[in-house]
Amino acid sequence: METHRRSSTNSIRSHKPARPIALEDDSTKASDALPLPLYLTNAVFFTLFFSAVYFLLCRWREKIRSSTPLHVVTFSEIVAILASVASFIYLLGFFGIDFVQSLVLRPSADVWATEDDEVESEVLLRNEDARHVPCGQALDRSIRSLQPPEPIVTAEKVFDEMPVTVMTEEDEEIIRSVVCGMTPSYSLESKLDDCKRAAAIRREALQRITGKSLSGLPLDGFDYESILGQCCEMPVGYEQIPVGIAGPLLLNGREYSVPMATTEGCLVASTNRGCKAIHLSGGATSVLLRDGMTRAPVVRFGTAKRAADLKLYLEDPENFETLACVFNRSSRFARLQSIKCAIAGKNLYLRFSCFTGDAMGMNMVSKGVQNVLDFLQTDFPDMDVIGISGNFCSDKKPAAVNWIEGRGKSVVCEAIINGDVVTKVLKTSVESLVELNMLKNLTGSAMAGALGGFNAHASNIVTAVYIATGQDPAQNVESSHCITMMEAVNGGKDLHVSVTMPSIEVGTVGGGTQLASQSACLNLLGVKGASKESPGANSILLATIVAGAVLAGELSLMSALAAGQLVKSHMKYNRSSKDVSKVSS
């Protein structure tokens, strides 16, 4: 407690007070609320009390003698009763003035500093150490210093630590305006023309509104200009996620160090072991099967026949070239590949598939679809466009259409793992892996009714690589569609393992790929930005690396399961020894 007291005192002394706190003449007193000096007020109410009581006693004695009911009172008696009650209330408060005086400068431990002293309130709110003690404890140090220290037992409220933020008077006015709702938080960037300053002001306003600290969320060291209008709105800081490296992954004759951003212990280590097994066995091979981003608007007609007419028109090969020309105007990289339609009554779903170069391509294909819809209004004026996306795409949702038709990059990756490597590195046997894969990834997933989930943990690797390289983490839903196959080859001595992933949605330009950290990870893989020699080559390479990393992760986890090492490894690498119950929330 003494440590907190000293730190609070020192930190407050470091701030220049707006006005000195007088200890004698200028100190606030409870009697300041009275209209007259204390000695005059006391004399008036003492005299009034005893006079009124004496008058009432005399009147009651006369009523008793004359047999007059006591409850029958005259106007003068009513005035005397009121005077005696009022003076009694004053005298009762007078005897408690000393007690009130001792508390008048010390706010309750359960409230923030009051608005009566604006400057002291701001110092208290900005002082980091003041959060460790009851509010106001640091402010009344001069008062307590005049009294002998006595142990006081109070119920202290634990406040979050508030970071020390240097704000100008202008910033302080803006913060108050945001807190009271006069200035919308989302408009700070446009009003201030300074993204870093806007984030700092928004952050401070949020802390004051919620009473919760954001001291653990970093603010400095980030380029807020880079995310304006592109990655995130109304920022108050940025997250820190550790990035580990798995590899080298030997894929198609080249080595790659795979960055993985994750908070799950054992994940990078396990994937790294899989990479080692693949490398010692001669590497893995990956092949691109399809490359096309999709978007499926939904339109409605008055009759199902009219919806069928449009379906036949769109699927007629003679009309495809015209539609492709209209679609491809949206971008110099966009190339319409196909249009597939599905009817539900009067509603028609049009699934456009488009090559998008090195971009993930959602915006590109959406603009192309809008061009085609505008073009179709000429021949089909009764077509009502319900939505640019009708979920037949299907984006960020597990869907059979993605599992069957594919979305983004469809990749298959395979490797033959030597029997000696299976035994020495993976600590299991070929036979055990093949049996476990059949019963877990195939039969077990079928029993669960899985859709694209015929794997051990593909989404673990996909999400970790996506976060590290600036992809959309929400698209791990369809991107993690994967079927893992294992088979004994070469007379049962070696293991053939493969992963087939029909919907890897990645890009090397746009979105989060332009952020400094994510751009560095893309550069590590050699896929930063757009390919100048062959448009789309970088995003295709990134997709194959994702598949290769998934292959390594599947191989290692399945081996741990087959050898009974899963629980042991997670107890070693995926448990925290920190006592989180002692961390203030």
From Swiss-Prot:
<keyword id="KW-0325">Glycoprotein</keyword>
<dbReference type="InterPro" id="IPR002202">
    <property type="entry name" value="HMG_CoA_Rdtase"/>
</dbReference>
<feature type="region of interest" description="Catalytic">
    <location>
        <begin position="170"/>
        <end position="585"/>
    </location>
</feature>
<dbReference type="InterPro" id="IPR023282">
    <property type="entry name" value="HMG_CoA_Rdtase_N"/>
</dbReference>
<feature type="region of interest" description="Linker">
    <location>
        <begin position="98"/>
        <end position="169"/>
    </location>
</feature>
<keyword id="KW-0934">Plastid</keyword>
<feature type="transmembrane region" description="Helical">
    <location>
        <begin position="77"/>
        <end position="97"/>
    </location>
</feature>
<dbReference type="GO" id="GO:0015936">
    <property type="term" value="P:coenzyme A metabolic process"/>
</dbReference>
<feature type="glycosylation site" description="N-linked (GlcNAc...) asparagine">
    <location>
        <position position="328"/>
    </location>
</feature>
<keyword id="KW-0560">Oxidoreductase</keyword>
<keyword id="KW-1133">Transmembrane helix</keyword>
<dbReference type="InterPro" id="IPR023074">
    <property type="entry name" value="HMG_CoA_Rdtase_cat_sf"/>
</dbReference>
<feature type="glycosylation site" description="N-linked (GlcNAc...) asparagine">
    <location>
        <position position="441"/>
    </location>
</feature>
<comment type="similarity">
    <text>Belongs to the HMG-CoA reductase family.</text>
</comment>
<keyword id="KW-0256">Endoplasmic reticulum</keyword>
<comment type="function">
    <text>Catalyzes the synthesis of mevalonate. The specific precursor of all isoprenoid compounds present in plants.</text>
</comment>
<keyword id="KW-0496">Mitochondrion</keyword>
<dbReference type="GO" id="GO:0031966">
    <property type="term" value="C:mitochondrial membrane"/>
</dbReference>
<keyword id="KW-0414">Isoprene biosynthesis</keyword>
<dbReference type="InterPro" id="IPR009029">
    <property type="entry name" value="HMG_CoA_Rdtase_sub-bd_dom_sf"/>
</dbReference>
<dbReference type="GO" id="GO:0005778">
    <property type="term" value="C:peroxisomal membrane"/>
</dbReference>
<dbReference type="InterPro" id="IPR009023">
    <property type="entry name" value="HMG_CoA_Rdtase_NAD(P)-bd_sf"/>
</dbReference>
<feature type="active site" description="Proton donor">
    <location>
        <position position="570"/>
    </location>
</feature>
<feature type="glycosylation site" description="N-linked (GlcNAc...) asparagine">
    <location>
        <position position="574"/>
    </location>
</feature>
<dbReference type="InterPro" id="IPR004554">
    <property type="entry name" value="HMG_CoA_Rdtase_eu_arc"/>
</dbReference>
<comment type="pathway">
    <text>Metabolic intermediate biosynthesis; (R)-mevalonate biosynthesis; (R)-mevalonate from acetyl-CoA: step 3/3.</text>
</comment>
<feature type="active site" description="Charge relay system">
    <location>
        <position position="396"/>
    </location>
</feature>
<keyword id="KW-0812">Transmembrane</keyword>
<dbReference type="InterPro" id="IPR023076">
    <property type="entry name" value="HMG_CoA_Rdtase_CS"/>
</dbReference>
<dbReference type="GO" id="GO:0004420">
    <property type="term" value="F:hydroxymethylglutaryl-CoA reductase (NADPH) activity"/>
</dbReference>
<feature type="active site" description="Charge relay system">
    <location>
        <position position="264"/>
    </location>
</feature>
<protein>
    <recommendedName>
        <fullName>3-hydroxy-3-methylglutaryl-coenzyme A reductase 1</fullName>
        <ecNumber>1.1.1.34</ecNumber>
    </recommendedName>
</protein>
<keyword id="KW-0521">NADP</keyword>
<feature type="active site" description="Charge relay system">
    <location>
        <position position="472"/>
    </location>
</feature>
<dbReference type="GO" id="GO:0042170">
    <property type="term" value="C:plastid membrane"/>
</dbReference>
<dbReference type="GO" id="GO:0008299">
    <property type="term" value="P:isoprenoid biosynthetic process"/>
</dbReference>
<feature type="transmembrane region" description="Helical">
    <location>
        <begin position="38"/>
        <end position="58"/>
    </location>
</feature>
<dbReference type="Pfam" id="PF00368">
    <property type="entry name" value="HMG-CoA_red"/>
</dbReference>
<dbReference type="GO" id="GO:0016126">
    <property type="term" value="P:sterol biosynthetic process"/>
</dbReference>
<dbReference type="GO" id="GO:0005789">
    <property type="term" value="C:endoplasmic reticulum membrane"/>
</dbReference>
<keyword id="KW-0472">Membrane</keyword>
